[in-house]
């Protein structure tokens, strides 16, 4: 299984100040073979401008690709926040540049962001908030096609005013089955996002996702830290790789030009 990170952000994303070069050198220092920058783009996001300067982004990553070509493979990707009201604009943006890889994510519902104990959670118990978020994710996977992997299904577990923010597969089984079934049938990848892997409940959630995705015919898994700084939680990456292998997935999916790569066995394993 290749050692990689397929979800992280640099200063090209509005919520990060990290230098792209630092991500590259940190990845090389820890033996990663391949990385993919996945900068944010969200249309009309409340409270923050998640625009993306594509010429500058591609120029910088192309320069790093050339500089480090003998040490690590670097891909250029995108994390696209999907609001189906702006489906046409989103598709135009994705098609406007030669991205290697696109993550589809849900960061807001309507005009309300799912972030940091905000309005989204008011007058909702945890289970109601999680159900609303997952239904929005289901709407995206059923009605949007222009992406490779669906990002952080546990995003709603990061935020909210609850003592226990964790999300459980069993409590959301019906919706999650529909999401996984849609991803599998459309041959989209499921992202394993290590952001919350310091909590054993997150490991259990992703273990359940992986096992059921496999049962439903899912083929492709991507792994990402969602790091907004160069430093990463390497133990969480190790835990995630172990879960992926236990579920019966022997390779992580990688992409070029938004097409799946024909992966070869890692020479470092």
From Swiss-Prot:
Question: What NCBIfam families does its record include?
Answer: hisJ_fam
Arranged from A to Z, the UniProt key words for this protein are:
Amino-acid biosynthesis, Histidine biosynthesis, Hydrolase
Which portions of this protein are annotated as coiled-coil regions?
none
Q: Which InterPro entries match?
A: Histidinol_P_phosphatase_HisJ, PHP_dom, Pol/His_phosphatase_N, Pol/histidinol_Pase-like
Can you state which reaction this protein catalyses? Answer: L-histidinol phosphate + H2O = L-histidinol + phosphate
Keyword DNA-binding, does the record have it?
Answer: no
Pathway annotation: Amino-acid biosynthesis; L-histidine biosynthesis; L-histidine from 5-phospho-alpha-D-ribose 1-diphosphate: step 8/9
- Which family would the database say this protein is a member of? Belongs to the PHP hydrolase family. HisK subfamily.
Q: Per the record's keyword annotation, is Lipoprotein included, yes or no?
A: no
Q: What is its EC number?
A: 3.1.3.15
**Signal peptide from the UniProt entry:** none
Question: What GO cellular component entries does it have?
Answer: cytoplasm
**What Gene Ontology molecular-function terms does this entry list?**
histidinol-phosphatase activity
Top class in the EC scheme: hydrolase
GO BP terms: namely: L-histidine biosynthetic process
The name under which this protein is listed is Histidinol-phosphatase
